[in-house]
A protein has these predicted regions:
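Amphipathic alpha-helical segments that form well-ordered structural scaffolds
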Residues: 1, 83, 197-201
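A generic structural signal for short coil/turn motifs at secondary-structure boundaries
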Residues: 13-15, 93-95, 185
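Amphipathic coiled-coil/heptad-repeat helices and related helical stalk/stem segments
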Residues: 23-24, 68, 194
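Phosphate-binding site of ATP-dependent enzymes
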Residues: 33-35, 42-43, 48, 63-164
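ATP-dependent carboxylate activation and anion-phosphoryl transfer catalytic cores
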Residues: 96, 101, 111-118, 170-204
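A glycine-rich, aromatic-flanked flexible loop/lid motif
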Residues: 156-178
Length: 204
């Protein structure tokens, strides 16, 4: 993603893609320009602490709820050690299943250091958040009724399906997304490019 700001203890610190200073006006101007920012802890896990800031039609948004400029700036000051980046949307054909960004888990092996091999992968789609893309795309299945949706992914052609709802103490087969009711089967449109990216990361 593009990196805009790091929330330091004295205010936002501009990062490589910011074209503004780390001031109130600079931060708010960037938000107005790009429209959406993902906000997440600089060193976190399990999507804990994920938030979304937005600006649309002359209105500021915090987690898709209307706010004013003062509220947005207060939010920034109250979230030190967070990083503000480009906000991703689901794509590659997966947006028809759920608008919330998905996760592709990939394992590569590279025994020769020059020829990485895709060894295993699966897709994980967010559940329990409806269509609200400001919510974390993963909730650990530690409470009753909380699950993640995992899909088998064919490494050769990017086709996916054979869904499993993974709860803390059991697994349920599911061909439909539990929030949207849409069938969880298809093919990632840009699979060759996805594999090329994974290969590049493995060679880095």
């Amino acid at each position: 993603p593009k990196y805009y700001f790091y929330a330091g203890t004295c205010g936002p610190v501009p990062l490589m893609d910011a074209r503004a200073r780390g001031t109130r006006d600079g931060f708010l101007g960037t938000l107005r320009e790009v429209g959406e920012l993902a906000c997440k802890p600089c060193n976190g896990e399990h999507a804990v602490g994920f938030n979304k800031l937005g600006y649309e039609g002359g209105t500021y948004l915090i987690n898709n709820r209307e706010a004013d400029a003062d509220a947005v700036w207060r939010f920034v000051r109250e979230h030190p050690n967070d990083i503000y980046t480009e906000f991703f949307h689901a794509g590659g054909g997966l947006e028809r299943i759920s608008p919330v960004v998905h996760t592709l888990r990939v394992l590569t092996v590279n025994p020769t250091a020059t020829e990485p091999v895709l060894a295993a992968c699966y897709l994980r789609l967010a559940t329990g958040v409806g269509g609200d893309d400001s919510k974390p795309n993963y909730r650990p299945p530690e409470q009753a009724g909380v699950c993640s949706l995992n899909l088998r992914l064919d490494m050769d052609d990017g086709s996916f399906g054979d869904g499993r709802l993974v709860y803390g103490n059991h697994v349920v087969c599911s061909s439909l997304h539990p929030d949207t009711g849409v069938p969880c089967a298809g093919t990632i449109d840009c699979w060759p490019q996805v594999w090329e990216l994974c290969e590049g990361l493995a060679l880095y």
